[in-house]
Design a protein with these regions (language model features):
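Beta-sheet entry/capping signal
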Residues: 45-46, 91-93, 193, 202-205, ...
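Conserved alpha/beta catalytic core and glycan-binding cleft of carbohydrate-active enzymes
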Residues: 105-141, 226, 230-375, 380
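Acidic/aromatic-lined carbohydrate-recognition and catalytic surfaces
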Residues: 2-184, 198, 209-257, 376
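A Trp-anchored, charged/polar loop motif used as the substrate-binding/catalytic surface
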Residues: 179-192, 196, 287-297
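Active-site groove signature of glycoside hydrolases
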Residues: 190-215, 309-318
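Loop/helix patches that line or flank the sugar-binding groove of alpha-linked glycan CAZymes
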Residues: 5, 236, 248, 253-256, ...
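Short beta-strand segments
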Residues: 12, 48-51, 204-208, 243-245, ...
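C-terminal beta-sandwich/jelly-roll accessory domains of carbohydrate-active enzymes
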Residues: 470-493
Length: 493
């Protein structure tokens, strides 16, 4: 695993909403470059940039029409390369968002695959043999091509699924992972990875990583596929980092990923922390962290230290943290996020407590996710400093509430969420026990009870973390000898 991941703290950038440098209402590469110092000053030393490739943007860029060309609305390939260069000057690393499971219907591969006459792309996607046959248990598109067949889709109906084969074959049109079509698809995706890694990218966050091989309930085929990719990367790009959207670390890390996310879907109980009716990190003190801890311990033991289990503050698919938590609750939530093993991921704006905006019209397939994708709030100038464009031209409307937080206001307030997170990041970087590879031992995580406590350790260094998000004082007994306090916030336990 790349050495730089030992102390990596990631910042997720949704590029169209981060910073607009040319007044067209859409964030861009130059805007990201202008704000690298801000991210670096916060303490984050790595970026994850959401899809920024050519796309008709039916799903905000997760419908790629050309994997090797930057979307013109953000800039050029050279502009993106400059992000890599400028980040590296600041000892920062950059992950791009790879979408290997499907493309847009506008991709040239799909246009060729739709043709009735066989060609090199005929098996690049998953097709049935007849337009009258629908793939069981999978969505499809049909009746849009000369080719006789229905094409499997992964998500929206304009996102045809790329063909990596079937682990278990039960229909004549299904191909095995070892057939020529699936093997060519995998090699084509390796070529995409080569292209960007050679340009200076440091690795990839991989979209829907656990779903590439079909009829693969236990994930054995998909694990084998990613092990193949890991061999290729270790051979050609040994420092490239990979994080998966899988949500099952024992499978992802076995497949060769360095990191896997705990997510709002899957078995992790991640939602119990911040995104349920009674979150554990709410002041009401009615939450339960025990199920999360049980699943975390299970994943931690199964993963056998093959990689990192990452707990994000949020992402572009989730409600914002601040939808359910107030500023003090957020401070304690970040004390948790920044003291756990794995690499922390901070979604842009979460560090200032940006709100989820209700009742926004869907933009580019966002639907109820749109409220978490509003423009970054830099200051109280026009459009919160995001863009000089007329407000009606903005990609998504900016939060217009009077109490909206801004970077400018938060930086000026010593007691702000931003400054608390900055302090927590500095502490994390100062103690190896708090970093990615430090061990963890849970010592108090009882059902429906507070506080929550664990010990982080590395060699002879040990740090006890005690968290009581509730509004009630709690007793905590332990037989440890404590030398000094590293960090303290709120009332005494």
């Amino acid at each position: 695993m790349s050495k730089w991941l030992d102390n990596a703290i990631f910042y997720e950038i949704y590029p169209q909403s981060f910073k607009d440098s040319n007044a067209d209402g859409i964030g861009d590469f130059q805007g990201i470059i202008e704000k690298l110092d801000y991210i670096n000053e916060l303490g984050c030393n790595a970026l994850w940039i959401n899809p920024c490739f050519e796309s008709p943007f039916g799903d905000a860029g997760y419908d790629v029409s050309d994997y090797c060309s930057a979307a013109p609305r953000y800039g050029t390939n050279e502009d993106l390369k400059r992000i890599f260069t400028e980040a590296h000057k600041r000892n920062m690393h950059v992950l791009l968002d790879l979408v290997p499971g499907h493309t847009s219907v506008e991709h040239k591969w799909f246009k060729e695959s739709m043709k009735a006459k066989r060609n090199e792309y005929s098996d690049r996607y998953i097709w049935t043999d007849s337009i009258w046959e629908e793939p069981e248990g999978m969505g499809c598109i049909r009746g849009i091509s000369d080719r006789d067949g229905s094409c499997v889709v992964n998500f929206f109906s304009h996102q045809p699924a790329l063909n990596y084969g079937f682990y278990k074959i039960d229909r004549p049109w299904q191909q095995s992972m070892d057939d020529k079509g699936p093997r060519n698809t995998l090699e084509a995706m390796k070529d995409v990875m080569r292209f960007w890694l050679n340009m200076g990218c440091d690795g990839f966050r991989v979209d829907m990583a656990g779903s590439l091989v079909k009829n693969d309930e236990e994930g054995k085929g998909t694990i084998k596929l990613w092990q193949n990719v890991r061999e290729f990367l270790d051979r050609e790009f040994p420092d490239a980092a990979m994080v998966s959207e899988w949500g099952e670390p024992d499978k992802s890390l076995l497949g060769g990923f360095h990191m896997d996310f705990l997510l709002h879907f899957g078995p992790s109980h991640y939602n119990d922390l911040f995104r349920c009716d009674e979150p554990y990190f709410s002041i009401r003190g009615k939450g339960d962290i025990s199920e999360f801890v049980n699943k975390y311990k299970e994943s931690y033991e199964k993963s056998q230290r093959k990689g990192l289990i990452c707990i994000p503050s949020g992402n572009h698919d989730m409600d914002r943290l601040a939808k359910r938590l107030n500023e003090n609750e957020l401070k304690i939530a970040f004390a948790f996020l920044l003291s756990m093993p794995g690499a922390p991921f901070i979604y842009y704006g979460d560090e200032i407590g940006m709100k989820y905006i209700d009742n926004l019209e869907s933009v580019e397939g966002g639907y109820d996710r749109t409220g978490s994708r509003s423009p970054m709030q830099w200051d109280n100038s026009t459009n919160a400093g995001f863009s000089c464009a007329p407000s009606e031209k903005l990609y998504i409307p900016v939060d217009i509430s009077k109490e909206r937080p801004t970077v400018e206001q938060q930086k000026a307030d010593d007691n702000s969420l931003y400054n608390e997170i900055k302090k927590l990041i500095k502490i994390r970087k100062s103690y190896k026990s708090l970093q990615s590879k430090g061990e963890i031992e849970f010592i108090c995580a009882e059902k429906h009870k507070y506080p929550f406590a664990y010990i982080r350790s590395f060699e002879n260094e040990k740090i006890l973390v005690i968290l009581n998000p509730s509004n009630n004082k709690q007793d905590f007994n332990c037989n440890l000898t404590l030398k000094n306090t590293v960090y303290y916030f709120g009332e005494e336990i």
